[in-house]
Amino acid sequence: MQLNSTEISDLIKQRIESFEVVSEARNEGTIVSVSDGIIRIHGLADVMQGEMIELPGGRYALALNLERDSVGAVVMGPYADLKEGMKVTGTGRILEVPVGPELLGRVVNTLGEPIDGKGPIEAKMTSPVEVIAPGVIDRKSVDQPVQTGYKSVDSMIPIGRGQRELIIGDRQIGKTALAIDAIINQKDSGIFSIYVAIGQKASTIANVVRKLEEHGALQNTIVVVASASESAALQYLAPYAGCAMGEYFRDRGEDALIVYDDLSKQAVAYRQISLLLKRPPGREAFPGDVFYLHSRLLERAARVNEEYVERFTNGEVKGKTGSLTALPIIETQAGDVSAFVPTNVISITDGQIFLQTELFNAGVRPAVDPGISVSRVGGSAQTKIIKKLSGGIRTALAAYRELAAFAQFSSDLDEATKKQLDHGQKVTELMKQKQYAPMSVFDQALTIFAAERGYLDDVELNKVLDFEAALLSYARGQYAELAAEIDKSGAYNDEIEAQLKKLTDDFKATQTW
């Protein structure tokens, strides 16, 4: 087959006309150094703070330092195989995690990927991990309770929906136990829970997940894990990821509770990243913005008003407020609450539950110190019956502690002082509670009623908890309607007071404890 010159030129023209050039603009850079999970990238223009940078092998790094001729980024995952000269690409996106009800009952990592072996999560939505907190106009005052199930907390240091209540104390004195019991107590309350484990041993986290499952609370809970073996970047980001998952419920008129266990380890991870990025260190070698690290996280816990929810859902949800309640945990060293991170978080939160080593070792568990524990807003959210009955509990305990200190120096005490000491001892004994045994509103109200009205005065100290158990068992059997009414409404009036008095008198007459 022979082609003449005209046909050849026509064929070439045809090919040129049909040729399509597909060009793609890529923001590319080159790795110039790798050390301890920090990479420096040259040539990556137009990158923003917190942008995800795609690395070879489907991994990502987070841009944190934007310098004149390079970008400092922290690798989210293993980095041993990264080398100088490798090409990286800017994505133009900031980190987002999957959110929604599909995550309930699952254990995920910081990026929202399942790590519980129960298959993929079919989440329909994602949300940025860094979000600006709701403004002043969008918020509503806290006036609904979060029942933790602990007598000592719900009576003296009440927590409201949308509050930030710090749990602070030394290691191994029950901080996590208190938070986990609070989550277990929400299984029938309509409050969704998020538990964020930061820098903990994998075995400890597995035990927490097992306990939540055993007590039927895992189905309403999302567990976010950044264990001690994870990179510092993932430990630093885990609380923000968990918060984004909680905000999904808050912004749709639901209530959620989030536990950060613990923010001390997050601050240490952030300090590690900052020092490796050569940011100037400050007090205790923490960077200058460690306060902002926690304030921008905890300010996202709030109660938002009906207008905010309606606007956010485009009118789909009307007349409902939403809330995200935060229980951050801080570990102190030898009870030093004046260290840098503890004082920061105390100043950000709406109160603190202080757990004391001396009380824990003395067998008072939960080891809540009522003297320096406080709730700045929860009082207005307290259940009515608990608020009415528990007014004297804190006073009795404070007076008992003060008198007990003086009583050590004096043997001849007057009758009034002896009576006050005896009452204080019994109230302290009554505040003890076993782990994984949260109490209902009725159980707490009846126990406090018995203590406040002097029904424990003739009960021996070592029989106080037996008396309580027998009283509650009797009440649930003989006064089931009253128990159901108080659990449902939390109301208190003269009629309920008379019924509680009759109940306790009837029980005392049986002498069965």
UniProtKB/Swiss-Prot annotation:
Main localisation: membrane
A Pfam family reported for this protein in Swiss-Prot or TrEMBL: ATP-synt_ab_N
Catalysed reactions listed for this entry: ATP + H2O + 4 H(+)(in) = ADP + phosphate + 5 H(+)(out)
GO CC annotation terms, alphabetical: plasma membrane; proton-transporting ATP synthase complex
Keywords: ATP synthesis, ATP-binding, Cell inner membrane, Cell membrane, CF(1), Hydrogen ion transport, Ion transport, Membrane, Nucleotide-binding, Translocase, Transport
Keyword Coiled coil: no
Membrane topology: Peripheral membrane protein
Residues that, per the record, bind ATP: 169-176
Localization, UniProt: Cell inner membrane
PROSITE patterns attached to this UniProt entry: ATPASE_ALPHA_BETA
Function: Produces ATP from ADP in the presence of a proton gradient across the membrane. The alpha chain is a regulatory subunit.
UniProt family annotation: Belongs to the ATPase alpha/beta chains family.
Protein name (database record): ATP synthase subunit alpha
Originating gene: atpA
